[in-house]
Amino acid sequence: MAEYKKNNNNDDKDYIEKLVNIRRVVKVVKGGRIFGFSALVVVGDGNGKVGYGTGKAREVPVAIQKAMDKARKRMKSVSLVNGTLHYPIVSSVGAAKVYMQPASEGTGVIAGGPMRSVLEAVGVHNILAKCNGTRNPISVVRATVEGLTSMSSPQLVAAKRGKTVDQITRKG
């Protein structure tokens, strides 16, 4: 359900908007049932920025629009190298445990469900990923975004340690 849409804000950026999940929720009252909808959306620019949002409303389009607005407001930057990660990451939120590992060129995005949406929106092209624990889409998306944003670039690590990037990234 990935769609390229023009952002309605003042800046002229194209975002990748992915609808991850829609849930129908019911409130039982004396006169019967009241139906509502909850939507989970991931928005990214395909170049290292990603955000997610949830929206609730009585109608599906309104819930999706609310979720997209929240996702655009909460966009975070991710440090990538050649369309993949710098190093393997493990992140967890609640019972959702997410493992992401960089992959060589041509591997593609090997991830399931909500993780795939986040990784494609942020602009990752080669990655191996696995989700353990709960398969709750909201928890999986949160864990994936937190893991990606917690990753620091070799330049930042080298600056903190007072070394050069070659000393940090050297194999052996």
Curated annotation (Swiss-Prot):
The protein's role, per its UniProt record: With S4 and S12 plays an important role in translational accuracy. Located at the back of the 30S subunit body where it stabilizes the conformation of the head with respect to the body.
An annotated GO BP: translation
Recorded family membership: Belongs to the universal ribosomal protein uS5 family.
Annotated domain remarks: The N-terminal domain interacts with the head of the 30S subunit; the C-terminal domain interacts with the body and contacts protein S4. The interaction surface between S4 and S5 is involved in control of translational fidelity.
Lineage: Bacteria, Pseudomonadati, Pseudomonadota, Gammaproteobacteria, Candidatus Pseudothioglobaceae
A Gene Ontology molecular function term of the record: rRNA binding
Membrane spanning residue stretches: none
CC per GO annotation: small ribosomal subunit
Gene3D superfamilies with a match to the protein in the record: 3.30.160.20, 3.30.230.10
Alphabetized InterPro entries for the sequence: Ribosomal_Su5_D2-typ_SF, Ribosomal_uS5, Ribosomal_uS5_bac-type, Ribosomal_uS5_C, Ribosomal_uS5_N, Ribosomal_uS5_N_CS, Ribsml_uS5_D2-typ_fold_subgr
Record bears the keyword Cytoplasm: no
Signal peptide: none
Sorted UniProt keywords: Ribonucleoprotein, Ribosomal protein, RNA-binding, rRNA-binding
Cytoplasm is among the record's keywords: no
Record PROSITE patterns: RIBOSOMAL_S5, S5_DSRBD
Record's protein name: Small ribosomal subunit protein uS5
Subunit structure: Part of the 30S ribosomal subunit. Contacts proteins S4 and S8.
Domain S5 DRBM: 15-78
Pfam families: Ribosomal_S5, Ribosomal_S5_C
